[in-house]
């Protein structure tokens, strides 16, 4: 039986198995048909299709009835909105009705969890922020990893959803107040004249992670740069209200991110005031990929090519599946796709296929890992 035929024959079983299974991501999918030895097919199109179908089904399986998307398949999984956002963005690369249903249900859940200016955990909260939760009962400790990136990546979801159809735009119009609040939350983390932030107030256009952790990270700011672009587009479609000069904030943020480049080290500071070492995988080296990944600096820019080449010199085996930390870090494959590195992306997707075709996931495989891989496939399959 050909690979594409196997996909068609097993997708329904995959989805049902995922929905019923409560084990971790390493064993959520059924084994392949008998006789399949799990070796990679030479036809990358079929390999892409298989992995795409497999990971899409996995992401869908993580959604709770409330619309929340769990980090992974265990019953008591954490629910980290930031991770879910990359999974949702991946579904939007294939805007079928089933995928759009998952996206809408997730967006509705996120809207329902927007914090006000005061919560039981924080009397001075940033309105429009969202806490992390825990399945199965969606309890929270009133904490988040960041405010800036959660908001920015959600705004990117919103604009990509709006670009699907007029019906999607109309649905978003009914949530204009929520989208405006999310935009405000992102803007409130930016060091600019309209804000007074804890720590440094340099009016440099860089965002801090949140008020309890006023660090200006390169990764977060690259995502905020994307979020500002999304907010500008949303505003042009009448989907948000804001008095902030988004274009000016974008220009300042872009200039300051580019200013984090350290000529003496041939890399970007991973945060303002913090130099990076090519010997440290996270956050130093991984951060180098983010300016080009999120369009702050074009992939064709010499600096983008330089840091990408240096990353691969320092961590040369990522495309074979080697993990340099606790997680697979498929954002590397996503960045490689943006850089047009088809050879390495093909190698990594083939590695994942070798697991998926045996009914396995890579260790510590989260929703964001599946999402970033699908985003990489969407870019590179046409190159």
State where each predicted segment sits.
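Alpha-helical repeat scaffolds
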Residues: 55, 100-106, 302-315, 344-354
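Heptad-repeat amphipathic alpha-helical coiled-coil interaction surface used
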Residues: 88, 155, 162, 225, ...
